[in-house]
Swiss-Prot record:
One of its GO terms (molecular function) is G protein-coupled peptide receptor activity. Glycans are attached at residues 16, 77, 89, 97. Belongs to the G-protein coupled receptor 2 family. The lineage of its organism: Eukaryota, Metazoa, Chordata, Craniata, Vertebrata. This is Corticotropin-releasing factor receptor 2. GO terms for biological process: adenylate cyclase-modulating G protein-coupled receptor signaling pathway; cell surface receptor signaling pathway; long-term synaptic potentiation. It is a multi-pass membrane protein. A N-glycosylation site within the signal peptide impedes its proper cleavage and function. G-protein coupled receptor for CRH (corticotropin-releasing factor), UCN (urocortin), UCN2 and UCN3. Has high affinity for UCN. Ligand binding causes a conformation change that triggers signaling via guanine nucleotide-binding proteins (G proteins) and down-stream effectors, such as adenylate cyclase. Promotes the activation of adenylate cyclase, leading to increased intracellular cAMP levels.
Length: 413
């Protein structure tokens, strides 16, 4: 249809551009537009080269219209407006003020600095966490005297954090070209990483089960079987990830299986189980704090001290049970402040959680500190004894003989 004839129809039957706003016809994107003159002090309805419909307007008005939804494949912020003047002689100004129409792409560029800072936080947090986690792992490995079921569960949780963080670093090293080529080894790394993510959350679930059983159900922990918790933590995630990998292979086999396509929910095969674990742990936390408050009220301590102890216990349990992930599980909003808070909070939480678990459940653990202190004193005593023996042996009583009597006296000290 000729552009001029189309504008005549628009001016006659859709002078307010209501139909065009509703249907967004393809006629809006005509490359040329001419003005059809009507007698009278008003400007006729017309369409500009961008595709914006300008309604019939009185002469002398400055008319505003919403910015186009998209142009040349770039989406724009439609909450802002474009302006055009209707002259006194009833003709439109040839220049339209599109300066307020900001591409949505600029919003992404606006967050570029925040994403870079968040990436630095991620690398720093994962490095600090791995260092703390490895130290905690070695302490649990060397201190055999504290190997009760509770500490064995802590040990396994710390192990999953170490493996998860190592796989995270491997994922960051994958080149973009390899990511696009969808190499087999790249998909294997993604699969292993997701397995350790799921095992990490399932060991948080094991922590919740143990605490809930011991505190709420008042069940003797001596009757709990270690192999049951090992099966839950390491074995149950396996079929979940295998199912996810098979579905990825047949239905979404691209980009190293990282991310997901719109409208496809394959990742929820394992993410759904993670969400379920977090919800159950939230119930565990609620019951544990409830029982704790009941016991504190029964004690003779003041109310302020009771609440302080309850808050302290809750804060300590949050990273152990993974409840902190639920604080910003989804983006709280699309405004700038919400986006920035979401970016930084998740970067800090995901990278430093291993560090906090190491601090709360190893470095500040009374049993671990006591056992480590005894082990240190024992090593110091043994070392000082060896030094004294070495000194005694280095001072002979004659050119050919060593006084073993002095060594015996030194060893008896």
């Amino acid at each position: 249809m000729d552009s001029t004839i189309f504008e005549i129809i628009i001016d006659e039957f859709d002078a307010n551009c209501s139909l065009l706003d509703a249907f967004q016809d393809s006629f809006l994107h005509s490359e040329s537009s001419s003005f059809f003159g009507f007698e009278g002090p008003y400007c006729s309805a017309t369409i500009d080269q961008i595709g914006t419909c300008w309604p019939r307007s009185l002469a002398g008005e400055l008319v505003e219209r919403p910015c186009p939804d998209s142009f040349n494949g770039i989406r724009y912020n439609t909450t802002r407006n474009v302006y055009r003047e209707c002259f006194e002689n009833g003709t439109w100004a040839s220049w339209m003020n599109y300066s307020q129409c900001v591409p949505i792409l600029d919003n992404k560029r606006k967050y570029a600095l925040h994403y870079k800072i968040a990436l630095i936080i991620n690398y720093l947090g994962h490095c600090i966490s791995i260092l703390a986690l490895v130290i905690a792992f070695l302490l649990f490995l060397c201190l055999r005297s504290i190997r009760c079921l509770r500490n064995i569960i802590h040990w396994n949780l710390i192990t999953t954090f170490i493996l998860r963080n190592i796989m995270w670093f491997l994922l960051q090293m994958i080149d973009h070209n390899i990511h696009e080529s969808n190499e087999v080894w790249c998909r294997c790394i993604t699969t292993i990483y997701n397995y350790f993510v799921v095992t990490n959350f399932f060991w948080m679930f094991v922590e919740g089960c143990y605490l809930h059983t011991a505190i709420v159900m008042t069940y003797s922990t001596d009757k709990l079987r270690k192999w049951v918790f090992l099966f839950i933590g390491w074995c149950i995630p396996s079929p979940i990830i295998v199912t996810w990998a098979i579905c990825k292979l047949f239905y979404e086999n691209e980009q190293c299986w990282i991310g997901k396509e719109p409208g496809k929910y394959i990742d929820y095969i394992y993410q759904g189980r993670v969400i379920l674990v977090l919800l159950i742990n939230f119930v565990f936390l609620f019951n544990i704090v409830r029982i704790l408050m009941t016991k504190l009220r029964a004690s003779t301590t003041s109310e302020t001290i009771q609440y302080r102890k309850a808050v302290k216990a809750t804060l300590v349990l949050l990273p152990l049970l993974g409840i902190t992930y639920m604080l910003f599980f989804v983006n709280p909003g699309e405004d700038d402040v919400s986006q920035i808070v979401f970016i930084y909070f998740n970067s800090f939480l995901q990278s430093f959680q291993g560090f906090f678990v190491s601090v709360f459940y190893c470095f500040l653990n009374g049993e671990v500190r006591s056992a480590a202190r005894k082990r240190w004193h024992r090593w110091q005593d043994h070392h000082s004894l060896r030094v004294r023996v070495a000194r005694a042996m280095s001072i002979p009583t004659s050119p050919t003989r060593i006084s073993f009597h002095s060594i015996k006296q030194t060893a008896a000290v």
